[in-house]
């Protein structure tokens, strides 16, 4: 993919190996709001039972960014195989035509998906008011 030329930086990860990043992604990662994810455990109190389960939302988010690219790359490879086998003009044959900015948007969405989480946030979701409870103050979409 043409996007490969945009990946100018690397982070070494014990799970995913080398995670390649764009200049824009580095800027997002270096922002204090993203850096705070280093101090939020991904698995909350699970480390009390499994002492080695101590990775942060920061590391998790980097992994999700990496996996989003892996998924896109596998879609591309499968499209090539599909096109060779069937050559029927199916939409899969056009996956290489995804614009670079859309690939970057996908990667940034993956990177930033946990930015709003606080500590033990999933544990408190059941106590949070649902959308229907705000219906009197929120406009109906």
Residue ranges and their predicted role:
Residues 1-41, 45-108, 116-141:
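Sequence-structural signature of the catalytic-core scaffold of metal-dependent phosphohydrolases
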């Amino acid at each position: 993919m043409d996007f490969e030329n945009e990946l100018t930086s690397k982070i070494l990860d014990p799970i995913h190996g080398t995670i390649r990043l764009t200049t824009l992604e580095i800027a997002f990662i270096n922002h204090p709001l993203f850096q705070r994810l280093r101090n939020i455990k991904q698995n909350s109190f699970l480390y009390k039972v499994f002492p080695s389960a101590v990775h942060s939302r920061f590391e998790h988010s980097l992994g999700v960014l990496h996996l989003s690219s892996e998924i896109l790359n596998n879609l591309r490879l499968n499209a090539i195989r599909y096109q060779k086998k069937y050559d029927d003009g199916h939409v899969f044959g056009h996956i290489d035509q995804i614009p670079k900015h859309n690939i970057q948007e996908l990667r940034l969405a993956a990177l930033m998906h946990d930015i709003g989480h606080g500590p033990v946030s999933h544990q408190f979701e059941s106590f949070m008011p649902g959308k229907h409870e705000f219906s009197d103050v929120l406009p109906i979409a």
